């Protein structure tokens, strides 16, 4: 039997899982990977440590499965988008990798907004412009760390770097690099004019060739094989942006379905075969894992990470939290929570807060407000996406909160949409493994027997949630005015 390895390098963990061509998972190992934040707004990773953890997780996955490495026919990597993982001219890590959640370029991005730069980029890139984009990080380095900037040999994103460690080959993968603001989505190529507009003249020469998600990028080297336990010569494909991987596993194949991801980030995505030139809102487009298709998505770091922070502060377990929230009448409390601990989707520099607390409120009310606030923030994206996809009547939901029945029911009641929850445990790993199957011409039948959990909205609570959502919007508008 042939097997396929999918690795997911996310915001908190690196996970590796081994699958057969039906998508059956035989083993999965995950390990926490540190985010270094030595200054306000910084979010970095030690690149050498990242590679060591990556290699260790692969080795442990193979050992746990008891599968012979020779039977692993392909490898794919899914990872966070954007950020910048730089190599010097000798292909050594050039400082730490900078993550998409890094905000050191905030002042620079505000200046670009004042100058109308995003509006000039958008017709060519179909991207917005924010602090985690490679271009923002690169321009910040050019201004604040010019010696490091001058030493750049190659610009990669995290899965490009890890693929390089496995194969020794340098590429930028299409689903990720198409959202860099250096890639012209109409021509399908890097565009020097975009770099010039951003004050990054000459930087295109530092970008490796673009490779498709399911294209073989190289083969496992002897050095990498020794560390990982993989067989020398195992094929490694381009891999993909984790948002694309999740959409793929959610079965998005037309414009009647949307995918909502509740994880470190709130993400809403849809898939289309064309770029709608008539839309006035700046929808974000990127290349999809299927040729000729685009992913359209909205995202912000305003999701379940907010709850995780409170869990750590209060030393709570999730079963206890769900019981607390389920004990309250839906949308009945005056307490609002703005889930901006890690960033905002309502304005640059906005921060988290509770509002509307009174003496009779309990911990349960605060927890309920966190659940609601995460969904209210998600709704900001969902409302915009439903303008782009007006035929969408079904929401497929993935991410950690899908394990919480009360949270799912809240989402259905609030949106009024029918929910489907794909019963796939590791969407990042499976999507990456699927690209590996395609790369080696395996006839995969991963989704033929996929089961779904269904959640129907309760219309009795729709009006109450909508009223509270209006208060949430008024609060974020007022907070934005204070900046």
From Swiss-Prot:
The keyword Transmembrane does not apply. Its EC number is 2.7.1.53. PROSITE patterns: FGGY_KINASES_2 (PS00445). The keyword Cell inner membrane does not apply. One of its GO terms (molecular function) is phosphotransferase activity, alcohol group as acceptor. It is an enzyme of class 2 (transferase). It comes from the Bacteria. Disulfide bonds: none annotated. It catalyses: L-xylulose + ATP = L-xylulose 5-phosphate + ADP + H(+). Pfam families: FGGY_C, FGGY_N. Keywords: ATP-binding, Kinase, Nucleotide-binding, Transferase. Signal peptide: none annotated. Homodimer. Belongs to the FGGY kinase family. This is Probable L-xylulose kinase. It comes from Pasteurella multocida (strain Pm70). The gene is lyx.
């Amino acid at each position: 039997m042939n097997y396929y390895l999918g690795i997911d390098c996310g915001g908190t963990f690196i996970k590796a899982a081994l699958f057969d061509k039906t998508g059956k998972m035989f083993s999965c190992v995950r390990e926490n990977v540190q985010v270094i934040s030595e200054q306000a707004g910084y979010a970095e990773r030690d690149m050498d440590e990242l590679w060591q953890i990556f290699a260790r997780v692969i080795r442990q996955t193979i050992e746990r499965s008891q599968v012979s490495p020779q039977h692993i026919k392909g490898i794919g990597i899914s990872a966070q988008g954007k950020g910048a993982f730089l190599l010097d001219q000798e292909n050594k890590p050039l400082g730490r990798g900078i993550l998409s959640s890094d905000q050191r370029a905030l002042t620079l991005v505000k200046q670009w907004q004042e100058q109308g730069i995003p509006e000039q980029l958008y017709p060519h890139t179909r991207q917005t412009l924010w602090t985690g984009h490679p271009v923002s990080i690169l321009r910040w380095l050019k201004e604040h760390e010019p010696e490091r900037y001058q030493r750049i040999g190659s610009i990669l994103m995290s899965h490009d770097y890890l693929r390089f460690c496995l194969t020794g080959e340098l590429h930028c993968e299409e689903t990720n690099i198409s959202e860099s603001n250096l890639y012209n989505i109409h021509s399908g190529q890097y565009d020097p004019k975009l770099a010039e507009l951003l004050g990054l003249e000459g930087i295109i020469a530092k970008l490796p060739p673009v490779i498709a998600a399911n294209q073989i990028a190289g083969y496992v080297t002897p050095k990498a094989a020794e560390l990982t336990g993989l067989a020398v010569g195992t094929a490694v494909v381009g891999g993909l942006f984790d948002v694309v991987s999740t959409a793929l596993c959610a079965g998005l194949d037309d414009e009647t379905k949307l995918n909502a991801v509740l994880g470190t980030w709130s993400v809403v995505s849809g898939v289309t075969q064309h770029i709608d030139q008539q839309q006035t809102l700046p929808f974000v487009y990127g290349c999809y894992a299927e040729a000729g298709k685009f992913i359209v998505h909205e995202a912000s770091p305003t999701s379940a990470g907010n709850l995780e922070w409170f869990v750590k502060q209060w030393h709570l377990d999730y079963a206890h939290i769900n019981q607390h929230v389920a004990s309250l009448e839906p949308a009945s409390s005056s307490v609002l929570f703005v889930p901006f601990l890690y960033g905002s989707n309502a304005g640059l520099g906005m921060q988290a807060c509770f509002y509307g607390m009174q003496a009779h409120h309990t911990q349960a009310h605060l927890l309920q407000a966190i659940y609601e606030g995460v969904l209210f923030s998600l709704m900001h994206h969902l409302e915009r996406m439903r303008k782009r996809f007006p035929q969408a009547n079904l929401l497929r939901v993935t991410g950690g909160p899908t394990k919480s029945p009360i949270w799912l029911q809240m989402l259905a009641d609030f949106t009024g949409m029918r929910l489907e929850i794909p019963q796939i445990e590791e969407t990042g790993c499976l999507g990456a493994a699927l690209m590996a199957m395609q790369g080696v011409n395996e006839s995969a039948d991963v989704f033929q027997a996929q089961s779904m959990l269904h959640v129907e909205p309760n219309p009795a609570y729709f009006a109450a949630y909508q009223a509270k959502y209006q208060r949430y919007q008024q609060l974020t508008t007022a907070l934005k005015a204070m900046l």
